[in-house]
Amino acid sequence: MTTPQEVLKRIQDEKIELIDLKFIDTVGTWQHLTLYQNQIDESSFSDGVPFDGSSIRGWKAINESDMTMVLDPNTAWIDPFMEVPTLSIVCSIKEPRTGEWYNRCPRVIAQKAIDYLVSTGIGDTAFFGPEAEFFIFDSARFAQNANEGYYFLDSVEGAWNSGKEGTADKPNLAYKPRFKEGYFPVSPTDSFQDIRTEMLLTMAKLGVPIEKHHHEVATGGQCELGFRFGKLIEAADWLMIYKYVIKNVAKKYGKTVTFMPKPIFGDNGSGMHCHQSIWKDGKPLFAGDQYAGLSEMGLYYIGGLLKHAPALLAITNPSTNSYKRLVPGYEAPVNLAYSQGNRSASIRIPLSGTNPKAKRLEFRCPDATSNPYLAFAAMLCAGIDGIKNKIHPGEPLDKNIYELSPEELAKVPSTPGSLELALEALENDHAFLTDTGVFTEDFIQNWIDYKLANEVKQMQLRPHPYEFSIYYDV
């Protein structure tokens, strides 16, 4: 634990000039306010720094816009992308009128989830290990106007560039990963080794416990970096650093990164598989003598995730693009089942050896368009509901789900086919979130209304380029 006094001393000792205060909005994007170093003191870590919250997506109206950012001293790190020595600090949000934590602040909701876990007596720590995939592109252009709508992506690794004619200063040297064949090739096919290495080492300098990096399955520059699991809020903080570092290192190399689940048609999308477990008094609770070495509690946790999965996906897969990834044929977990080692199931129990501390489950549906604080909190609530109500997940599905007969497949529940359907499921099933006191009814309704009005309905209003291909000459 780091104290406010230690942070203030560091500012003086390391001659920090600016303090960059970061907080996350409802949708999942970091926002920031930069202060001169003499503008914070010990009270900033308790009373907070005032700001106008009226322009933050999904937050206050303009007539009640005053809010405060409360600095978390445990999150201070030197920003490697600022020219002037700058200390970044992550904040949670308070209501200045009441002094209460703001019920729409995702980081506050995440803390409530931990408090709820402790209050149940089930455990005292929830660990999460997200694996967020992404694409590195050389160019990304898109526009939507009254008379046009398009996107154009390009990558030096794109299989579509295999026949592209080069120039004298930039010849085509081949070695493009083919569709669905991008997993683990060495250079020169993997042209992003050095970029990923810099991303990984930069994260390490910021205190993220790094593990690995590698190319992913899709053509066009799909990659993944790995970091160690952490406590719920800690892991969410690390994931935000992960995205921040990856985007900014890519920019340094003249590249651009997206965490969209399905930017490329006809190839694998990008997910964010979430490993998770509950501990108490320093001991893991998911290891036992049941299926795949799980405890009964671990199975009940799976039961909660599977029961509430359609509603959960409105939070863990919260974009219209999410459901273009969740389709058969691209290693996507479209069927709601669990299995040991079977990556075609939506929940997998990894083969983790004999160490009980490594026993965990992996929920494979989520993607990185989710807000990690909200996603982790919602998954924990669903799992706890399974434990409290002893929701058994049924028999595991150890077959390859993609090879089941139509009759067998009809018996396996599937993920919602669209964001609208997921939001409808959340509308009908959210007591497991609100009865806990973790999420408020106000937050859930605001989330549903925001997503419907600003994303679902907006997509429905606009002509799609493919519609012209199939309907123009009717």
Swiss-Prot record:
One GO process term, biological-process aspect: glutamine biosynthetic process
Top-level taxonomic group: Bacteria
Keywords for this protein: ATP-binding, Cytoplasm, Heterocyst, Ligase, Magnesium, Metal-binding, Nitrogen fixation, Nucleotide-binding, Phosphoprotein
Main location: cytoplasm
EC number: 6.3.1.2
Parts forming coiled coils: none
Domain GS beta-grasp: 14-99
Binding sites annotated in the UniProt record for Mg(2+) 1: 131, 273, 362
Regulation: The activity of this enzyme could be controlled by adenylation under conditions of abundant glutamine.
Cited Pfam families: Gln-synt_C, Gln-synt_N
SMART domains assigned: Gln-synt_C
One GO CC annotation: membrane
Other known facts: In Anabaena, it is present in ammonia-grown vegetative cells as well as in heterocysts (for nitrogen fixation).
Protein name: Glutamine synthetase
Organism: Nostoc sp. (strain PCC 7120 / SAG 25.82 / UTEX 2576)
